[in-house]
Design a protein with these regions (language model features):
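Catalytic core of the metallo-beta-lactamase
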Residues: 8-19, 112-166
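Pre-active-site segment of Zn-dependent metallo-hydrolases
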Residues: 20-63, 70-75, 149-165, 342-343, ...
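Active-site neighborhood of phospho(di)ester-bond hydrolases with catalytic His/Asp-centered motifs
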Residues: 24-26, 54-68, 83-86, 142-147, ...
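Active-site-proximal loop/helix segment associated with metal-binding centers of metalloenzymes
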Residues: 27-32, 37, 123-138, 147, ...
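Active-site HxH/HxHxD metal-binding segment of metal-dependent hydrolases
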Residues: 44-110
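Metallo-beta-lactamase
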Residues: 84-139, 247
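Cap/insert and terminal regions of metallo-dependent hydrolase folds
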Residues: 155-250
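Feature captures hydrophobic
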Residues: 263-466
Length: 466
């Protein structure tokens, strides 16, 4: 392969120029993440590991541990140049530099030459994710990994138009499980819909997105993991498999490239590295990593949890309290103390059933997303939802950007608005639109109008009517 790329699993891609590995993205070589919940769908081969080790450049999209996998980075030679998006807070830059790597922050929308025929551009965004654009010869590869577009759709569409459609590729997440799914009612009964009810819509949305961007090829990426903790294996049926994509893909003019493939950008041909897409289920354990669900918090430890929640002034407008259930002991932490006089049925809150060690690690390091994505924690919703406020505010703005107060949030918003005003409005309008559609679905179901409205909406966006 003179010029091309290969997919190694999850979000790791390796780009080649003249048969030489030039760039590896989000290297996760072995081990687990999310408190031992996720493992690689299949272990890397020695050749795949060697390709990552030989690449001169490493690009890290964001701070989630399946992308920024510290144990994997520690295995790489320190002569690498690590490229990073221009994220709001320098924590990732500083931590990787402290490991001994040379670190370069890629300015927004500026090309960086990596080899004679390969150059790259990075688009950081307010979700604290990063999108990588790689030009290799006369081909263009957009690595969305698991980032939302965040107002970059217009820019990417105009960029992709400059290339032969057959030579444009978008590598993207296609998954429903890479976020909190483990919702329960007050009796502890899981309330998430069956997998088949959720998978189709996700696959349709990805197909629609790739088509709208104008790309000719979809590369399945950032989705190849398996749940291996005893208390998270229940989520494995919710993983979107390649068979699911084959069954429900709705844009036949967009070529699908399955996981674990090598793509020759000179010819456009690709070949599979494995005869099947079988997951390495032998990695599944009967253990819960470092957690003991019966362990309780001490008084000092409860105080640490309380102080962690109190840091988030940005939550006050949207939530009254958070409940934590640890070792069968339930405690309420008030976000709005003035709400104590309200009737319970009017309060807005979220309850988390969570083991001690993972909770304390989350409180110490501040990355609440990790405990949500692991899907071993159970979540109760009381007149509240995780989106559009809780997860973005506590996990993205708080954990990644270190934005906790309303004034800090205003400064944060100004940064992204000034850089791309139109994209900023488009992205925020899309979020309000999604919230509005959720209300429409809720009311249409109660008024008996769900079916006709669904038919109209799906015809408007070009999805199947089923």
């Amino acid at each position: 392969m003179r010029l091309g790329f290969e997919t190694l699993g999850n979000a790791t891609l390796v780009f080649y120029d003249n048969d030489r590995p030039v760039l590896a993205t989000d290297p996760w070589l072995d081990g687990t993440c999310y408190f031992g919940s996720w493992a690689l769908d299949r272990p890397l081969t020695e050749a795949e590991r060697e390709a990552v080790e030989r690449a001169q450049y490493i690009w890290i999209s964001h701070g989630h541990p399946d992308h920024l996998h510290n144990d994997s980075l520690a295995q790489l030679p320190k002569n690498k140049i690590v490229l990073l998006p221009d994220h709001y807070h320098p924590e990732i830059r500083d931590s990787i530099a402290a490991m001994g790597f040379t670190v370069e922050v890629m300015p927004y929308r500026q090309w960086r030459q990596l080899s004679p025929r390969v150059r790259a551009m990075c688009l950081d965004n307010e979700n604290q994710d990063g999108i990588l654009v790689v030009e290799a010869g006369d081909s263009l590869v957009v690595d969305l990994n698991d980032s939302p577009l965040c107002g970059e759709e217009r820019f990417l569409r105009n960029l992709i138009k400059r290339y032969d459609r057959a030579k444009t590729y978008v590598a993207s997440l296609c998954a429903i499980d890479a976020d909190m799914l483990n919702f329960v009612d007050t009796q502890g009964r899981r309330t998430v819909e069956p997998p088949d009810q959720r998978k189709k819509g996700m696959i349709w949305a990805v197909a629609r997105k790739i088509d709208k961007l104008g790309a000719g090829n979809f590369v399945s990426s950032a989705s190849q993991h398996i749940y291996v903790r005893a208390d998270s294996v229940w989520a494995n049926p919710y993983r979107v498999t390649w068979d699911d994509v084959e069954t429900h893909w709705t844009r036949p003019h967009v070529r699908k490239i399955e996981p674990f493939c090598v793509v020759d950008l000179g010819t456009g041909a690709y070949h599979k590295k494995h005869p099947s897409q079988r997951s390495a289920v032998e990695q599944i354990t009967n253990a819960t990593a470092d957690d003991d669900w019966s362990a309780r918090l001490s008084g000092d430890e409860w105080q640490r949890v309380t102080e962690f929640v109190a840091r988030y002034e940005t939550l006050r407008q949207h939530f009254d309290y958070l409940d934590f259930v640890v070792g069968n002991e339930r405690r309420r932490i008030w976000i709005v103390p003035e709400a104590k006089g309200k009737a319970e049925t009017r309060l807005r809150g979220i309850g988390f059933h969570v083991p001690k060690n993972s909770l304390l690690a989350t409180v110490e390091y501040g990355f609440f997303d990790d405990i949500l994505i692991g899907n071993f924690m159970r979540t109760e919703l009381h007149n509240a939802t995780l989106y559009p406020h809780f997860t973005p505010l506590i996990a993205k703005l708080g954990g990644a950007a270190k934005v906790y107060t309303d004034s800090e949030r205003r400064r944060f918003n100004q940064r992204y608005f000034r850089r791309n005003p139109l994209g900023y409005f488009e992205w925020h309008f899309a979020q309000y639109e999604a919230a509005f559609l959720d209300h429409v679905r809720w009311w249409s179901e109660r008024l008996g109008l769900k079916r006709p409205l669904k038919v109209i909406y799906r015809r408007m966006i070009g999805d199947p009517v089923v």
